[in-house]
UniProtKB/Swiss-Prot annotation:
It holds the Pfam family Acetyltransf_11. GO terms for cellular component: cytoplasm; membrane. The lineage of its organism: Bacteria, Pseudomonadati, Pseudomonadota, Betaproteobacteria, Burkholderiales. InterPro entries: Acetyltransf_C, Acetyltransf_C_sf, Hexapep, Hexapep_transf_CS, Lipid_A_LpxA, Trimer_LpxA-like_sf. Involved in the biosynthesis of lipid A, a phosphorylated glycolipid that anchors the lipopolysaccharide to the outer membrane of the cell. Its main location: cytoplasm. Belongs to the transferase hexapeptide repeat family. LpxA subfamily. This is Acyl-[acyl-carrier-protein]--UDP-N-acetylglucosamine O-acyltransferase. It is found in: Cytoplasm.
Amino acid sequence: MAQIHPTAIVDPAAELADSVVVGAYAVIGPQVRIGAGTTIGPHCVIEGRTTIGVDNRFFQFSSIGALPQDMSHDGEITELVIGDRNTVREFCTFNTGTRKEDGVTRVGSDNWIMAYVHLAHDVRLGSHCVLANNATLAGHVHVGDWATIGGLSGVHQFVHIGAHAMIGFQGHVSQDVPPYMTVDGNPLTVRAVNLTGLRRRGFSNERIGVIRQMHKLLYRDSLTLEQAVEAVGALRGQQAEAQSDADIAVMLDFIAGAKRGLVR
């Protein structure tokens, strides 16, 4: 049986696994489903059609599953889906989706989300990401796995952030950020490969070397984007590690799908 504080308000229709803990003065709505081992801190509000996986931790005063901040939203039923083992710190706000995409805001698993982070409608946040205090993701932003977004950063609607990318403190992100890169400054520019992050995740020296080659072609060799993409593509099939070809494919696929232009 779920452990619910006497002052919490949990709608009888909500579905809570037996080991869920709900803190003082929390409010849980009727369309909420919460998986085993998840802790809901004091004064949290979980509402809307929200599905939460197992072993998540929500700290006090978070607002999860509220209606999207989108003036075109006219009451259609949309959703928020959150994976497993996420940490969500104080005063975070996650909104449900809109019908402009598939109606679902999605959060992966194993994310570390610090205080005052905002995830707007239709955001797709991958897994193993770190979002520092006050990071703000506007509507339709997509973030790849293992990305890091610095504190007080603002990400413009529809921006895509690649896997393993790192955005520095107070980043003003209005264009797509390629995978594996560190970006910083105002205006935002690519500074280098995210070497520290890649090494922590076990990337071999060869894989890192290939990623550095891609960085050089894209950002240091004074090539047009079309020329750089062709040169990056020419790296395929020349590597001893098959995974390096996969890393090249990740970069090429990201560039091909970029709709707001690349940070360069």
